[in-house]
Design a protein with these regions (language model features):
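Alpha/beta-hydrolase superfamily serine-hydrolase fold, recognizing
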Residues: 1-151
Length: 151
């Protein structure tokens, strides 16, 4: 499931989740943050490619402020499942993921932010050459097992 779908299902109580793992999540088509500008090109994930993907996903629908598309515009996230948010320091999506984690916390949702210093978007797929990636995977597993145990 992608982040907007989980947001909609969980906040409408259509789905009961012990937790969610958001790994360098994309939270909307209009990325306008410091990290999206600083890491827009040359850091694996290109902002122009991300916008193209959203255009394909949304078609002609242009209401990017709809929380079903961009959960950062949600009026209320009360009842959303606990979240583990994995961010890479050198990722254009970093700042919006951190902002979403803050929004979840504002509505009383338990959030763990795991930031990989010096890493790029997609670093978890490189665990065979980046030992720190496996440390993040272990941290995610630990937090997720706690969420499930407390569900």
């Amino acid at each position: 499931m992608n982040t907007p779908n989980v947001h909609c299902a969980a906040t409408r109580h259509e789905l009961s989740l012990a937790g969610q793992v958001l790994i360098y999540p994309t939270l909307g088509p209009e990325v306008m943050t410091d990290s999206s500008h600083r890491f827009a090109t040359g850091y694996i994930l290109e902002i122009d490619h991300l916008r193209y993907d959203y255009q394909q996903y949304l078609g002609n629908w242009s209401d990017h402020t709809d929380a079903r598309v961009t959960p950062l515009f949600a009026d209320d996230l009360t009842g959303a499942p606990s979240a583990i948010v994995v961010v890479a320091e050198c990722d254009p999506l970093r700042d919006e993921a951190v902002a979403y984690a803050g929004l979840l916390e504002h509505f009383g949702v338990r959030v763990e932010i795991l930031e990989a210093e010096g890493m790029l978007h997609g670093f978890l797929r490189m665990g065979h050459v980046i030992p720190d990636a496996m440390d993040i995977v272990d941290d995610v597993a630990m937090h997720l097992s706690q969420y499930v145990a407390n569900a």
